[in-house]
């Protein structure tokens, strides 16, 4: 009986220690990313679908990107570099003019005309 209790205790410790260590490697960050439409949302979230990222959501209304990731696999700096490489400014880095020029015309968030067009489009549909 004593042997059985010892084996159970060892098993509990063996399973508890690895899971405890993993949870300390998980972090969630939120940061601003410029964009204006659903295409931007798809592009931003797809770009951050990388090894180590567990969850990503970019909110069109607030422009806040929330990322949950493993700190032992990827860094927050990688997110900013990845997004600027595909043409989206973040609160820490600005996309190059070359990268920005490659995004679709309706996604040109630096243009006041495009921003206004998306505001008009949003205001004209139902909010049920």
Residue spans of the language-model regions?
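Bacterial Sec-dependent N-terminal signal peptides
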Residues: 1-26
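The N-terminal extracellular segments of secreted preproproteins, especially immediately downstream
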Residues: 10, 36-39, 105-106
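General secretory precursor processing signal
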Residues: 14, 40-43, 109-110
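Processing junctions and N-termini across compartments
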Residues: 15, 31-34, 100-101
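Cleaved targeting-peptide boundary
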Residues: 20-28, 121, 126
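N-terminal targeting signals for Sec/Tat export/insertion, comprising classic cleavable signal peptides
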Residues: 28-57, 61-62
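Mid-chain, structured segments of secreted extracytoplasmic proteins
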Residues: 60-108
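Histidine-centered metal-binding segments
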Residues: 106-128
């Amino acid at each position: 009986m004593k042997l059985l209790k010892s084996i159970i205790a060892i098993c509990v410790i063996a399973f508890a220690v690895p899971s405890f260590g993993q949870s300390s490697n998980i972090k969630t960050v939120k940061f601003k990313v410029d964009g204006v439409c659903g295409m931007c949302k798809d592009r931003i979230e797809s770009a951050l679908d990388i090894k180590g990222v567990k969850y990503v959501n970019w909110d069109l209304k607030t422009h806040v990107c929330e990322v949950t990731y493993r700190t032992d696999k990827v860094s927050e700096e990688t997110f900013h570099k990845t997004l600027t490489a595909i043409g989206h400014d973040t609160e820490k880095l600005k996309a190059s003019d070359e990268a920005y020029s490659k995004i679709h015309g309706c996604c040109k968030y630096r243009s006041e005309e495009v921003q206004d067009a998306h505001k008009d489009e949003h205001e004209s549909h139902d909010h049920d």
